[in-house]
Every structure is written in structure tokens, then in C-alpha cells.
Amino acid sequence: MLTVHFVLAYYSLHINCGGKRVTANGNTTFEEDASEAGPSTFTRSRTNWGLSSTGHFLDNSIKTDAYIQTNTSRLLMSDSQLYTTARLSSISLTYYGFCLGNGNYTVNLHFAEILFTDDKNFSSFGKRIFDVYIQVTNI
């Protein structure tokens, strides 16, 4: 018997964190990341990425933990659907890209502060600190 293994290499990864699958920036498809993953979970997409999340939100007034936040204000920038939702995690949120082919990549991370409303903003709550690792190297 002959066993054949096919290895599929991907050369791009675009995720709409906390949102539905959308096409933006002309022709780039951002994959859906809309599952209500809980406080301690690993979720794998149907393609080449997954995420792990840990932690409960203990210091807020919400009775159940919500792990996806939706912006309700009007956004005026192009491709605003990419900035409408966000995945939340109280301790750690990690995305993994699987089967990415060897090569040089350009990494673009897009962030939008959509959680605070009224007179509160990100600067009133302190810094946002995160680490980005590529091939086990902190960049």
C-alpha cells in the first residue's frame, strides 16, 4: 500500500478578529472569527489558523462573560467592517498560523479601541501591552 501525504502551504493569513468573513482592501478576504469561544479554549478554523484564549472577566458588572465586543458607533474610515468587532480575553489571547510556507512576509496588525464609550477612553485605563511572536521570535 502506498501512502501519500499532501502538504498544503499557505502564503497569507487574514483574520477579522471577532467578526464575520469580509472582503476588504479591494480583494483581500479576512476569515471569520465569530465563534463565542469561552474563557479557556482552543479553536481551530476551517483553514490554516487557530486561537487560544484564557481568563474570566471578574471585575466587571456583566453577569456573563462576553468574548466578542461590537462597536455601535458610526465608523467613517474605509473598510470599517474590519473595525466593528473585537475578540476579548482577560489574560491571554493567541492566534496561530498553520502551514505557512517558508518565505518573507509583511505583517500588518490593525487595532481599534471599540470598548470604551462616553467620556472614557483607552488613555484613562492605562497602556495596552502585547507581544508578537513569529517563528518563536518576539518581534
Describe every region a protein language model picked out.
Residues 1-139:
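Compositionally biased, intrinsically disordered or flexible polar/acidic segments
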